[in-house]
Amino acid sequence: MKREYQEAGGSSGGGSSADMGSCKDKVMAGAAGEEEDVDELLAALGYKVRSSDMADVAQKLEQLEMAMGMGGVSAPGAADDGFVSHLATDTVHYNPSDLSSWVESMLSELNAPLPPIPPAPPAARHASTSSTVTGGGGSGFFELPAAADSSSSTYALRPISLPVVATADPSAADSARDTKRMRTGGGSTSSSSSSSSSLGGGASRGSVVEAAPPAMQGAAAANAPAVPVVVVDTQEAGIRLVHALLACAEAVQQENFAAAEALVKQIPTLAASQGGAMRKVAAYFGEALARRVYRFRPADSTLLDAAFADLLHAHFYESCPYLKFAHFTANQAILEAFAGCRRVHVVDFGIKQGMQWPALLQALALRPGGPPSFRLTGVGPPQPDETDALQQVGWKLAQFAHTIRVDFQYRGLVAATLADLEPFMLQPEGEADANEEPEVIAVNSVFELHRLLAQPGALEKVLGTVHAVRPRIVTVVEQEANHNSGSFLDRFTESLHYYSTMFDSLEGGSSGQAELSPPAAGGGGGTDQVMSEVYLGRQICNVVACEGAERTERHETLGQWRNRLGRAGFEPVHLGSNAYKQASTLLALFAGGDGYRVEEKEGCLTLGWHTRPLIATSAWRVAAA
């Protein structure tokens, strides 16, 4: 149209005004006809393409696609965006609404020789989408460096460099062309890949910047200032994060609080570059270190914590198989100990919501010869609102027992600590009938005994009380970890290993559960996982930030519990192969259970994530005199 107007004007250079008017009328008439010939669908999208040019435009678009595809072959990976990014920064295009001329201009640019592509920064050369930190062996789960002694200088304090920043400074480029080819934040959208780190070497990717359409880039380049693109090497940041955590713990042990404070301030920045389990674990350990460095202790809210802990405990039960495994293996040992008994009594040192006992009641109801008379004593802490939560639990269990026709009796004991219990509290009420069969007692403790280690002599008193009632069996479930070391650095390193694996199992289990139970089918695993992370985070804070009587999460290994119970007059009871097989079957039914492992260890059963045991179930009886 533009050339037609110029030719019309040129032909009337020496003519009369009437001739000029005639030419003007012809131009207007041609324009009107051209607008009528424009494709209506493309016109609605803002593009002017005549129907007669549709075939030509389609051919040019196909050629453009082929040219861009050839460019992608020569510039693999993240360089694809850089291959065509100069179209928005180096070239002045025709009006984009004129689709035919716009495509033709880009096609001519692609056919021209391209400037050299600058090498990608090291952080963007490899990619990894795993949120799991692996060791050099690639074991498949979160593995940290081996624990170091307090005297080791492996994790000596050293400065941690800031993330690499790619700027658009022309002086830093080899040429103006290289400067223009570096994408900036003006008009582009950025997205970060899944964070990943490998302590033994491997792949990682930093921030990736995706190019916007050429028209948007051209407009943004003209109107918006250049924004630096931050490229973070997540592999290096992950290694520095772990070293910063351990160096901070070493500084705390040496009471070098100035160095510890400097490291505490760097940990959140390093943790932000990570993803998945590593970021969450680092956040909780960073918070715990900050509480210890700044000597910040929350207000005394023991009663409120008891109610909130029960809520978190319920979510932890739903999100992963650890508590299910604990209840199942303990119930199996109790069921075998009650074989042939007509009157049985279970003392639960931490009844919580009573989730362990419906399964045992049902198993007893199906026992050949009929169910026994079942009495349950539930021990729990006082409630903040002074409600009788223990009786509410007993009422629900009584209703369930009635439906399956089991003779059921219940009694709740409120105790601030298990050390307050006396033997007479666990004995049957009233005098026993001489004609009745004696009552067989079982004592059950799930994640309770380690809390007694905070008070000198408390564990010995409780074990003495248990020994006095002469139980047929005592079932104990505890964390398989040593978080009761006198050295703060050793305790910190061990807990970092333990909870990293625990969080990794939550991530792995939740992903498998999401596949089998999508939200539309009522999966609802998101809330359970978040609350379970809070449940574990409170334990981390207690292990790291607290000391003395406040530090109640004093977990010990199976070997240490074996020594303590042996000194108290108990001997181990072998958990049979039947419990092992049924526990393995239970895990096979649990979503995401591929990473969980059940192992038998000296007559006890452990449940772990891959090769790391995390909890252990053991059974005991009063040793023969």
Curated annotation (Swiss-Prot):
Q: Where is the composition biased (Low complexity)?
A: 189-198
Show the coiled coil region(s): none
Segments for region (PFYRE): 441-542
Under the cellular component aspect of Gene Ontology, which terms does the record hold? nucleus
What sections of the protein cross the membrane? none
Q: Where is region (Leucine repeat I (LRI)) located?
A: 239-294
Keyword set for this entry? Transcription, Transcription regulation
Domain of life, source organism: Eukaryota
The region called Leucine repeat II (LRII) is annotated at: 392-431
Segments of this protein annotated with the region SAW = 545-621
Region (Disordered) spans which residues? 1-34, 167-208
Q: Which residues lie within the region annotated VHIID?
A: 313-378
Motif DELLA motif: positions: 39-43
Motif (LXXLL motif) on chain: 449-453
Where's the GRAS domain?
Answer: 232-621
Indicate which residues form the motif LxCxE motif. Answer: 246-250
A Pfam family cross-referenced in the UniProt record is DELLA
UniProt remark on domains? The DELLA motif is required for its GA-induced degradation.
Record family assignment: Belongs to the GRAS family. DELLA subfamily.
Per its record, how is this protein called by name?
DELLA protein SLR1
Give the organism, scientific name.
Answer: Oryza sativa subsp. indica (Rice)
Q: Which gene encodes it?
A: SLR1
